[in-house]
Amino acid sequence: MDNPTDSAGKCPVAHGNTPRSRSNRDWWPDQLNVQILHQNSGRADPLGQAFDYAEEFKKLDLDGLKKDLHALMTDSQDWWPADFGHYGGLFIRMAWHSAGTYRITDGRGGAGAGQQRFAPLNSWPDNVNLDKARRLLWPIKQKYGNRISWADLLILTGNVALESMGFKTFGFAGGRADVWEPEELYWGPEGTWLGDERYSGERGLAEPLGAVQMGLIYVNPEGPNGTPDPLASARDIRETFARMAMNDEETVALIAGGHTFGKTHGAGDPSFVGVDPEGGELEAQGLGWTSKFNTGVGRDAIGSGLEVTWTQTPTQWSNYFFENLFAFEWELTKSPGGAHQWQAKNADASIPDAYDASKRHLPTMLTSDLALRFDPVYEKISRRFLENPDQFADAFARAWFKLTHRDMGPKVRYLGPEVPAEDLIWQDVIPAVDHPLVDDKDIADLKEKVLATGLTVQELVSTAWASASTFRGSDKRGGANGARIRLAPQKDWEVNQPAQLAKVLGVLEGIQKNFNAAQTGAKKISLADLIVLGGAAGVEKAAAAGGHAVSVPFTPGRMDASEAQTDAHSFAALKPRADGFRNYIGGRQFMKPEEALVDRAQLLTLTGPEMTVLVGGLRVLKAGAPEHGVFTSRPETLTNDFFVNLLDMGTQWSPAAGRDGVYEGRDRKTNDVKWTGTRVDLIFGSHSQLRAFAEVYGQADTKEKFVRDFVAAWTKVMNADRFDLV
């Protein structure tokens, strides 16, 4: 057989494993990345498009699975022995780190797709040796197959670990379907592990990031940049946990609850540890961090480099964490691996050894643990938990459930018999449908009533878009269901044009009130439905004005959430700083406008063509800032004029003097200004792939296709949060 690496037989595909393999992004690193719109598109899914995980999960023998997981907890393996004879601490850390990447700023990260299996997360320094945890689980995953996803299994195993050590959990919901390729997420600007170029000014952490250093889940347990300062650590903890949507009480409960179990690993110098899983050789088979320190496992294991066991009963739920935290004064010391940690003064050796029952050690803590005592706010909460163990247990159970379910969206997505009955405000509760829904005749009549009010296409379309486009496919939050656009904070967002919004909502509420009052039975229409229906009426009117008769699909069933069901502070995270679909920029930005457009399109689960057709349609319908990007002489008519005029070689573009981010399109012959546009508008003529999409919609023979595709993409956004329709 010929040598496959001979120059005459080089593979024509660039695999990225030799110096000759340079991607387009290597050549043009600042090029707009549109590929994130097509990741996890389904072509890489070995289960196929027809696979329905929710249906498979219903077939799962959950009791049998949990029984097997309970047995695994104490089935210590020689190749990776269990600390204290119990894998509970390891599996809690695995589940925590699967969920703990979640960040509220953009809803990305979290446990929802099982991304811990893939790079870069599988090789983050903070995830050291979690590859072993997942390998311990493989026989169980192999046994139960497609009825339990890796994403669900990682979290369920953490729950079972807690239960097996005497803790009563709040519940568990399945429903996390696996993906089959790594997500392209912005984890930070650094090019080295544990770099912290993400900070500016006085400890200002860049957004949307949620960790202090590249490759960490939250904070450095030794203290900021390894400086053992508990108060400085508290500042980092408060910031990073808040970015994960946790308040101070939840933060204290999570840290203390998690550190009630298990231990850290720092038996020797980290220099003994080999490369991470993704950088390993073929024969390593995806396992990394092989240690050459003595046996490299068990008592000789090296992970974080810290060597801390927090409690006297590391395989049983207790209140020892707080008892130890406040019982002793603490002195700075170093682990055998050289990491900063703290040791109790004048204490008895009461902490068991993980592998020798005859040995005892002095109590130890991390710098980040001592933050719970020396920060005045955390200290008050910690003392309350010390004195009220039942409150601590309840707070940890609830915070753990929130941690592991935060990115799953509304309860309608929860699966299984262990779903808790209680509604929690962070679940963005929407009332269940409690009345008959409108039928086709009602829908037609309501459309006529909406159009008869004199509300314009622009007003109807922009209001519906504002309501629906808050949806985030990352954590399944936002969307039109609930009609929260009428509540604080959304009703006051500048991007939603509050004065116009109040006018439109007032008119629609009048129609809703009159319709509901006129019914002889219990039939009703919610404002959430009527907002979307009004948008559909506006789109149909605009299409008709352009010579296209279309019917925009509409499915009733949305309900209206109340103020009591809405955490206004939490919803503030959904406020767009930029919305390229509406040509809006407001506030401090952390990406270019065109990058923000693609970012929002990805959150809306749109493809490149869907994003393109929506921008073109929304521009001519004047759904956003009216002064830029409206490349048409017949606004509020659904046409492909945006693309026709953008691609017109009779127009020459140049930056507008004194107007940052604004461009003027001038007639090449007369030099008269024809249009003004933004970076978001011009990117569809500048970026080669987006231009290819734009050219399709700018062709003379695709006017009908443009309208048809716009309606389809519009409907997709309007229904993005209709999990009841899936």
Swiss-Prot record:
The free-text note explaining how the cofactor binds reads: Binds 1 heme b (iron(II)-protoporphyrin IX) group per dimer.
Q: Which residues form the active site?
A: 97
The entry's heme b-binding residues are: 259
Under the heading Pfam families, the entry gives: peroxidase (PF00141)
Sites annotated Transition state stabilizer? 93
* Chain intervals for the UniProt region annotation (Disordered): 1-26
Changes after translation: Formation of the three residue Trp-Tyr-Met cross-link is important for the catalase, but not the peroxidase activity of the enzyme.
Q: Name one GO biological process term.
A: cellular response to hydrogen peroxide
* Signal peptide boundaries: 1-16
Q: Tell me what reaction this enzyme catalyses.
A: H2O2 + AH2 = A + 2 H2O; 2 H2O2 = O2 + 2 H2O
Q: Where is this cross-link: Tryptophyl-tyrosyl-methioninium (Tyr-Met) (with W-96)?
A: 218-244
Q: Which InterPro entries match?
A: Catalase_peroxidase, Haem_peroxidase, Haem_peroxidase_sf, Peroxidases_AS, Peroxidases_heam-ligand_BS
Keywords for this entry?
A: Heme, Hydrogen peroxide, Iron, Metal-binding, Oxidoreductase, Peroxidase, Plasmid, Signal
Gene Ontology MF term list? catalase activity; heme binding; metal ion binding
Q: Which residues form a coiled coil?
A: none
Q: Show the cross-link location (Tryptophyl-tyrosyl-methioninium (Trp-Tyr) (with M-244)).
A: 96-218
EC numbers, comma separated: 1.11.1.21
SUPFAM superfamilies tied to this protein? Heme-dependent peroxidases
Q: Which cofactors?
A: heme b
Give the multimer and partner information.
Answer: Homodimer or homotetramer.
> Which family would the database say this protein is a member of?
Belongs to the peroxidase family. Peroxidase/catalase subfamily.
Q: What does this protein do?
A: Bifunctional enzyme with both catalase and broad-spectrum peroxidase activity.
> What's the protein name?
Catalase-peroxidase
Q: Which organism is it from?
A: Rhizobium johnstonii (strain DSM 114642 / LMG 32736 / 3841)
- Protein encoded by which gene: katG
